[in-house]
Amino acid sequence: MKYLTTIMLVAFLNSTVMTKEIKTTIQINASPEKVWSILTNFENYPKCNPFIKSIKGNVKVGNKITARIEPPGAKGMTFKPRILAYETNKELKWLGNLWFSGLFDGEHIFELIDNGNGTTTFIQREKFKGLLVPMFKKMLDINSLNGFDNMNKKLKELAEHE
């Protein structure tokens, strides 16, 4: 009974207290096709992406890739997320974790919305959950959010001036 109570408490905390979402949005004066071609040109990430420095591997649903992020003002990290969604010109989503699932998991989503007038709304968000999330909330609110913003601005610049 004690074991069951502990499991239920951890599950409750993991679904409420131990969650965090950060989200950024930017309007880009370019078609979703143009934005997508830049977003998924992973070979150029080291020189063109100020936040995600590299993505290696076959970016296909179900596959694991290797990604390196370098948030401004924070230590960079390399991790191996699994691709959850890849819908051309619309969405790329992966799920990564620190050491094991439930400790610090991040579901990263890039979403492109066709505004129907030659422009795109680009949404970048990440849903974090796990036991360590409360310890990293400040870093997520500042460093990761700034990294998202920097990446979004660079994507906009590249899409609008290429």
State where each predicted segment sits:
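Hydrophobic pocket/interface hotspot
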Residues: 34-39, 45, 65-67, 83, ...
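Hydrophobic-ligand binding "helix-grip"
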Residues: 56, 73-119, 127-129
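A conserved amphipathic terminal alpha-helix motif
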Residues: 121-123, 127-162
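Generic structural detector for well-ordered beta-strands
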Residues: 25-29, 68, 82, 111
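Short beta-edge strand/loop motif at the mouth of beta-sheet-based domains
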Residues: 43-78, 86-89
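Sec-dependent signal peptide recognition
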Residues: 1-8
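Hydrophobic ligand-binding cavity/cleft-lining segments
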Residues: 4, 14-56, 60, 150
